[in-house]
Structures are given as structure tokens and as C-alpha cells.
């Protein structure tokens, strides 16, 4: 890739929502993320996404010629690999790959690339959570990093996406966006939310993923979905700025 420009954007935003009478939302909670595009050479697209202590880099190679067993005659085939921060990949990473595939498949205009292959590799540099118990922070960062890398690679997409981790604290029932490792340890339930956006990131089209683990009731679910939509909307707005800052210098006036 020639003269790739690395763009870093830091966004810090908080929850200004009024407390819910049944499930109080932590109004002091803030989410801090960093994103960088075009960080790797010798691949078609790459990105780095950092959220608190969780850091993921993603590379995209494609469209390329697939192996015979991978080829799909009418659409693009996806090869998704997740590599852990420590050790070798296990069943845990295979589950992350399946969830990541479920999120990315509806976003890509696959019929534009028949008999081709796109390789998406996510390397987790820092987990930011107890890997034996949780994977929501890693999954959320992998989703966001993969989307940015696909844009950097110039792969045709149908829509945008943004993903956030959420936790419900055990004693207070506070709904925390982007929880820390310490907050996860005292959580009643944990959730990874990924939403699909259209119309320039202004309209939510679909819930791509809601991966939940733990105990929660219907009211808490609706509350976290409401808060999650608000936070994903803010995140996708900042992702658009990152993309705009990256693409603008490449345009020929």
C-alpha cells in the first residue's frame, strides 16, 4: 500500500441519559476509544482499535483467489482468523470467529466478488479482561477493527456497524458501557451489542449481534438496548470521522 496515511482519533464521551427508575444508568460512565487506519504494509487494509485496556489490530487481504474448497461461485468467501493475546488459538477464539463472521457477512456486498476470497485477521494485543471468564471486550474491539480495516481495503459494503460491551453491576443494577476488568468481575450479566447503521450512520437498520451471558430481566434488557443504541450512534459518528480523515487526502480535486 502506497503512502498510507495513519489517522488516529481519540473520542471520549459520556452518558447524559437521566437515570432509569428501575435500572439506573451510570451517568458518570465514559467511554474512551482510539482508532488508527492503515497501520500495516503488504496488506490491502488494516486498522488498530483500542478501548481502555483492550487493543486489537486487524488486517484485510482481498479479494484474492481462493483455494478450491473455499470458493463460492456467486459471492465472496470469507476467511476469518482471531489470534489471542497469549498462547495459541483455542475453541474460545473459534467461537469469536463465528460471531465475527455473523456480524460482518451482512455488511459486505459479497455478490460483487464471485469466486474470490477475503482474509480478515484480528490479532488481540491486549485482552483487558479475564480471558478465562469473559470475551466481550475483545469481541467488540474485533468487530470495530474489522469494519475499519474493510473500509481501508476498499471492500464494497452495504452499511456501517459499531459495537460496544455492556455490563450490569450485581449490587446496584447499574448499566455500564465499556466496563473495566474490575467491573466485569462484579457484574450480574455481560453483553456485546453490534448495530447496523444506514443513511450515513443516522438510522439503525438491524441488530447484528446481541451476545449476552448472565442473569437479567426484560426491563434491564430494554434499558441496555436503549443505552446501547445511543452509545453505538455516538461511536459510529466518530468512526465516520476517522474514515473521512483517511479518505479525504486520497481524493483528486
Regions found by a protein language model. Give the residues of each.
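Polyanion-binding surfaces on beta-sheet-dominated domains and ring/shell assemblies
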Residues: 1-253
Amino acid at each position: 500500500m502506497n503512502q498510507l496515511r495513519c489517522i488516529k482519533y481519540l473520542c471520549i464521551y459520556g452518558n447524559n441519559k437521566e437515570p432509569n427508575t428501575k435500572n439506573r444508568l451510570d451517568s458518570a460512565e465514559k467511554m474512551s476509544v482510539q482508532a488508527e487506519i492503515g497501520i500495516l504494509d503488504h496488506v490491502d487494509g488494516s486498522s488498530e482499535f483500542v478501548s481502555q485496556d483492550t487493543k486489537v489490530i486487524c488486517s484485510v487481504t482481498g479479494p484474492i483467489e481462493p483455494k478450491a474448497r473455499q470458493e463460492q461461485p456467486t459471492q465472496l468467501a470469507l476467511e476469518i482468523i482471531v489470534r489471542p493475546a497469549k498462547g495459541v488459538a483455542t475453541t474460545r477464539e473459534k467461537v469469536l470467529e463465528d460471531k465475527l463472521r455473523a456480524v460482518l457477512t451482512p455488511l459486505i456486498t459479497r455478490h460483487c466478488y464471485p469466486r474470490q476470497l477475503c482474509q480478515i485477521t484480528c490479532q488481540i494485543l491486549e485482552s483487558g479482561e479475564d480471558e478465562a471468564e469473559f470475551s466481550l471486550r475483545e469481541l467488540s474491539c474485533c468487530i470495530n477493527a474489522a469494519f475499519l480495516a474493510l473500509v481501508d481495503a476498499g471492500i464494497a459494503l452495504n452499511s456501517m456497524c459499531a459495537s460496544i460491551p455492556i455490563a450490569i453491576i450485581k449490587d446496584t443494577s447499574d448499566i455500564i458501557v465499556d466496563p473495566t476488568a474490575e467491573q466485569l468481575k462484579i457484574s450480574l450479566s455481560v453483553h456485546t451489542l453490534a448495530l447496523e447503521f444506514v443513511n450515513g450512520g443516522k438510522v439503525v437498520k438491524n441488530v447484528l449481534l446481541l451476545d449476552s451471558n448472565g442473569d437479567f430481566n426484560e426491563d434491564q434488557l430494554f434499558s441496555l438496548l436503549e443505552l446501547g443504541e445511543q452509545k453505538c450512534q455516538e461511536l459510529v459518528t466518530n468512526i465516520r470521522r476517522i474514515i473521512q480523515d483517511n479518505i479525504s487526502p486520497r481524493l483528486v480535486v
